[in-house]
Curated annotation (Swiss-Prot):
A motif ('HIGH' region) lies at residues 128-138. One of its GO terms (molecular function) is ATP binding. It catalyses: tRNA(Arg) + L-arginine + ATP = L-arginyl-tRNA(Arg) + AMP + diphosphate. SMART domains: Arg_tRNA_synt_N, DALR_1. Pfam families: Arg_tRNA_synt_N (PF03485), DALR_1 (PF05746), tRNA-synt_1d (PF00750). GO terms for biological process: arginyl-tRNA aminoacylation. CDD domains: ArgRS_core. PROSITE patterns: AA_TRNA_LIGASE_I. It comes from the Bacteria. This is Arginine--tRNA ligase. The gene is argS.
Amino acid sequence: MIQAKEELLAALGLALAELVPGSDLAPAFENPKQAAHGDLAITAAMQLARPLRKNPRELAQALVEALGRQPAAQKWVDAMELAGPGFINLRLKPAARQQVVSAVLSQREGFGVRAPNGQRVMVEFVSANPTGPLHVGHGRQAALGDAICNVFATQGWAVHREFYYNDAGVQIGTLASSTQCRLRGLKPGDAEWPASAYNGDYIADIAREFLAGATVKADDRAFTASGEVEDIDSIRQFAVAYLRHEQDLDLQAFGVRFDHYYLESGLYSSGRVEEAVAKLTAAGKTFEEGGALWLRSTDYGDDKDRVMKKSDGTYTYFVPDVAYHIHKWERGFDKVINIQGSDHHGTIARVRAGLQAAGVGVPQGWPDYVLHKMVTVMKGGEEVKISKRAGSYVTLRDLIDWTSRDAVRFFLISRKADTEFVFDVDLALKANDENPVYYVQYAHARVCSVLARYVEEHQGDLATLADADLSLLAEPTEFALMNKLAEYPEMLGAAAADLAPHNVAFYLRDLAAHYHSYYGAVRFLDGAVEPMRARMALLEATAQVLRNALAVLGVSAPRKM
C-alpha cells in the first residue's frame, strides 16, 4: 500500500492541477474514520469549494473523473465513491494492500526508516539535579526523551542526547549540609536536624561512604572522599559525584543513554555566564534597580521584567539557562528540543526572552519544548507518595523493581505528555489483556509461536516467505492487518513532526488488536501449502513491525511468554 499510496498521491496532484490550474493545495489523503468507508479519503473538493465558489460535491465528481484518467488510479484503485458533502472514498485493489508484506520482509529493521537527511537534532532530557535519586517524573521524562530520540533517528536525523546537570545551585549546598549533619550523627526527627535538609536514606549512604574514604566515578573522573567531617568542599564534591553515579546506574537500568553530560558549573568556570550577561548589557536589554541587574524581558513577551543578578552578586537560576541555550545555538543543531516537567512552564518565556535579547540570531519560538505532567503511583489501590530510599517521593528504581523496565517505559509513554498519568503497579503486573504492554508483547510472542509451529510441523522455511503468493491473502482480517502495517512509516513521520511518541504506543495497541482478531478468525496452519505460506509471510511481517515499533519505545519483544 505504501508504493500505491505514493503513486496515487502523485496522481492526485496531477488531477488537482488539471482541475484547478495554479492551485497551491497540496495533494493529501486521510484515513477514513470507519474501515467500511474504504482505504483512503480525499477532502480536497471541500477545501477548494469556498475559494472557487463552487459546489463541493460537483467539484468532487470532477476530481473523481480527473483522477480516474491517471494511470496510477487505474492500476491501484478498485472504486471511487462520493460521500456526504464532498468526500471521496477510495477502495484499493488487493495488490495495493498486499505489497506492504513484501516491503517489510525486504526492509526488515529498515521498514519505516528514512535515509539520512543531513540534519542534526539535540534533545535535552531528564536533566535532574544531582541531589537525590531519580523520581518517577524523571522516569517519564527519560521514557519520552529516549523515544523522541529514537523516532527522529527513524526519520534520518543525526540525534544528540544531552543531560544538563544543575550542579551549581543552592540545592547543592543543601545536599552538602545534609550529608554533614549525618556525618555528625544527626538524623531526621532530631531537634537539631535542619528543616530544609534532605531526609532520604541515601544521605546516610553518602555519609557512610564518605567516612570510609570511598572513591566514586562520574564523567570518567574519580572523586575520593577526605573522610573529614568539617571538609565541606570534599563533602559537596563527593556527594554530587556519588549521586551522579547513582543516577547513571538508574538510567542504565532503564536502558537510557546520553551522548553528553553538560555541567552548569562549567558555564561559570568557562566564563559563559558572564559572556551572556555582557551580550545582554551591550545590547541595552538590561537595567539596574534596587541594587540588582534586570532583564527587559517584557520587550519579548514575558509578563514582567526579570532579575538577573541579585543585590548580593549572585545570579538567578535562569541566567545560566540563557548561557546554556546560547551555547546550544552556537553548536549548530538544526533543531533543539527540551523535555521538562510542566512546572518549568514559567521559565520558557524568560529563557526565550534572554535568547532574543542577546542578539545572537536565535529565531523566535526556539527551542521546542515538550512539557509533561506529573505521575501518580498507585499500589494495592492506594496512592504511594514516599520511598524509604528517597524519603519524600517514589523513585524510578522503585517502579522498575516493583514491575519491570518494559512496563515502566511503555506505561510512561502510553499517554500524551501534557496529561497527568496514574501508574497502576498492580495493572503493570497483570498477565492479561488489561495490561497494555503485556497485550502488545503477547501479540509478538503469539506470532513467533505460530511461526515456530510452521517450521516444526510443516517443515516450513521462513527464509523463503518473501516468495509467497501474496495474492492469496484475501480475508477481511488480512486486509485490515495489512492496512495497519502500511500505516507504520507515516505514523513515525507524524510522531516526529508532532513530538508525539505516544503515537507509537497507540499504534502498537492497534496493531496487536488487529493481529489478535486475525488469530481468532483464521486457522493459520490448516489447508493448502501456498495459502499457508502467504499467511506465514503476513505473520512474519507483523512480527517485524511489532519489533520495530517496540524498539522505538525501548521495549523488548519476547518470543515466548
